[in-house]
Amino acid sequence: MSITPQEALTRCIEHREIFHDEMLHLMRLIMRGEMSPVMAAALTMGLRVKKETIGEIAAAATVMREFATKVDVPAEVSDHFVDIVGTGGDGANTFNISTASMFVAAAAGARIAKHGGRGVSSKSGSADVLEALGVNIMLTPEQVAESIETAGIGFMFAPNHHPAMKNVAPIRKELGVRTIFNILGPLTNPAGAPNILMGVFHPDLVGIQVRVMQRLGAKHAVVVYGKDGMDEVSLGAATLVGELKDGVVTEYEIHPEDFGLQMVSNRSLKVADADESKAMLIEALENKPGTPREIVSLNAGAALYAANIAGSIGDGMKLAREAIASGAARAKLDELVRVTNQFKA
């Protein structure tokens, strides 16, 4: 049975859940532009105030995936295939740690399908820093698949893969606050990577997002929240982890000291723009001693664990350090620049 947007809004006001099939229907109305902007804005805020449930988020993500422009990756390259992504919105304004980690993880044997956009809540989104590094981000789905096959990394610029989001973009911009769409981005990888390292902006989302990934059929998901507020594995505090492996969800806490690292503030990782982020990212890839290199090694280690290349985050970190020290991580950046620019007309 379908539900009207007004009925759904009443449910939110009464703090009652919207059921799976109802959420599918409502989300399809939004994606097709068949719900008025006023109603769509009211409903997204109603969900936010009520607090979105695992079922509501999973249903909304299912619809976003339906409407996405997919990237078809050959089965033979789907082993160790992983997405490294953050929800953003952590307000930390650090350099692009997950983007730097992507080069390291790929150099150590992972296949990366990274899905991102321009900075909204941050000074530099993944698209901004990749452009500053010389990567061509305007690829067709076929070119992204080829980039994954040849360079081990494919970057999917979110607006190219979610055309239906044009119906939501003005609402999100005018509201200017976090909505369910901030949570959905990392759940809707157009290449369908079965494994994921996901950073989230709130501790409650660790348990929620990992269970959403479980419902969406992920194989290995590692969801992290640094207790200093970072949507990464942090060096400045303990990190909460929600992990889905072999169909089972576990939640635990990790600390920098577990990996032989000192706890240090993330203050030294802050940047003002994409150019500063680029400089710090290159420092880390070029093995310059310091906090950027350490946090990239740690997060790349977590990505290698999520990709089932390493048996633990600690083992993954050792592989990440080797990839940086050997120059392979820096070479991977140069390779991605070369491969993506070959596609320019």
Swiss-Prot record:
Binding-site residues, anthranilate 1:
G86
| Source superkingdom | Bacteria
Q: Which UniProt keywords apply?
A: Amino-acid biosynthesis, Aromatic amino acid biosynthesis, Glycosyltransferase, Magnesium, Metal-binding, Transferase, Tryptophan biosynthesis
- GO biological process terms held by the UniProt record: L-tryptophan biosynthetic process
Query: Pfam families, alphabetically?
Result: Glycos_trans_3N, Glycos_transf_3
Needs which cofactor?
Mg(2+)
**Pathway in which this enzyme or protein is active:** Amino-acid biosynthesis; L-tryptophan biosynthesis; L-tryptophan from chorismate: step 2/5
- MF (Gene Ontology): anthranilate phosphoribosyltransferase activity; magnesium ion binding
Q: What are the binding positions for Mg(2+) 1 in this chain?
A: S98, E232
Annotated binding of Mg(2+) 2, by residue: D231, E232
Known catalysed reaction(s)? N-(5-phospho-beta-D-ribosyl)anthranilate + diphosphate = 5-phospho-alpha-D-ribose 1-diphosphate + anthranilate
Which residues take part in binding anthranilate 2? R172
Q: Name one GO cellular component term.
A: cytosol
Residues binding 5-phospho-alpha-D-ribose 1-diphosphate, per UniProt:
86, 89-90, 94, 96-99, 114-122, 126
What is the free-text note on the cofactor? Binds 2 magnesium ions per monomer.
Q: What is its EC number?
A: 2.4.2.18
Q: Note the subunit structure.
A: Homodimer.
Name the job this protein performs: Catalyzes the transfer of the phosphoribosyl group of 5-phosphorylribose-1-pyrophosphate (PRPP) to anthranilate to yield N-(5'-phosphoribosyl)-anthranilate (PRA).
Q: Which family does it belong to?
A: Belongs to the anthranilate phosphoribosyltransferase family.
Write the protein's name. Answer: Anthranilate phosphoribosyltransferase
